[in-house]
């Protein structure tokens, strides 16, 4: 459970932070862009017992086309929902500053190498809907 949290937590953080960068951008091109791309952003890496460390990394961001159409047979809908997600990543480990005695100072996070629009995979992305 802890291993999954260490991996999925940073992945979700990268996706959310990347999404925030897109929403905050003032460029008209970013507002109309449809697709999935690698984009640089900065986040604060932290864990209990250590000071935070600002990290600049690459993450996936974008907007992918989705659609649904009614059909006559169950389940009565044909859905095509794709998300901007990681296709290829590498893991980077950094040492957090000023950790308390007994606290592991190392923090590992994914760096996006390639991103694509695709089906949501719980191995790399938090796939819950609202």
Curated annotation (Swiss-Prot):
GO terms for cellular component: cytoplasm; extracellular region; extracellular space. Its main location: secreted. One of its GO terms (molecular function) is hormone activity. Pfam families: Cys_knot. The keyword Glycoprotein applies. InterPro entries: Cystine-knot_cytokine (IPR029034), Glyco_hormone_CN (IPR006208), Gonadotropin_bsu (IPR001545). Keywords: Disulfide bond, Glycoprotein, Hormone, Secreted, Signal. Glycans are attached at residue 87. It is found in: Secreted. Residues 1-24 form the signal peptide. Disulfide bonds join 36-84, 50-99, 60-115, 64-117, 120-127. Highly expressed in brain and at low levels in pituitary. Also found in retina, testis and skin but not in pancreas, parotid, kidney, stomach, liver, colon, small intestine, thyroid, brain or adrenal gland. In pituitary, colocalizes with ACTH, suggesting that it is located in corticotrophs. GO terms for biological process: adenylate cyclase-activating G protein-coupled receptor signaling pathway; G protein-coupled receptor signaling pathway; regulation of thyroid hormone receptor signaling pathway. The keyword Ubl conjugation does not apply. SUPFAM superfamilies: Cystine-knot cytokines. N-glycosylated. Heterodimer with GPHA2; this heterodimer interacts with thyroid-stimulating hormone receptor (TSHR), and hence stimulates cAMP production. Functions as a heterodimeric glycoprotein hormone with GPHA2 able to bind and activate the thyroid-stimulating hormone receptor (TSHR), leading to increased cAMP production. Plays a central role in controlling thyroid cell metabolism. Belongs to the glycoprotein hormones subunit beta family. This is Glycoprotein hormone beta-5. It comes from Homo sapiens (Human). The gene is GPHB5.
